[in-house]
Amino acid sequence: MSLEELETRVRKLSMRATDAKMNLHDLAEELPVDWEKIPETAEATFAVFKELTAARRALKAAKKAAEEA
């Protein structure tokens, strides 16, 4: 994946992570309504942040490799 593609991926994942975080926040604010949705919302939030962290690491490594080249 090119540096530009990695940067685009990180930006998109960052937006998804922000949306997931807000969904979890909104759910928490409305408790006890929809408390059954906590596991699925938390799992989705965890998954997107895990993916974002991996993409950020890949981008950082790619930038470092580009600097050394």
Task: Locate the predicted segments by residue.
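Short, charged, intrinsically disordered terminal tails
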Residues: 3-5, 60-69
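Short, charge-rich amphipathic interface segments used for partner binding and complex assembly
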Residues: 29-65
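N-terminal acidic leader/helix
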Residues: 1-29
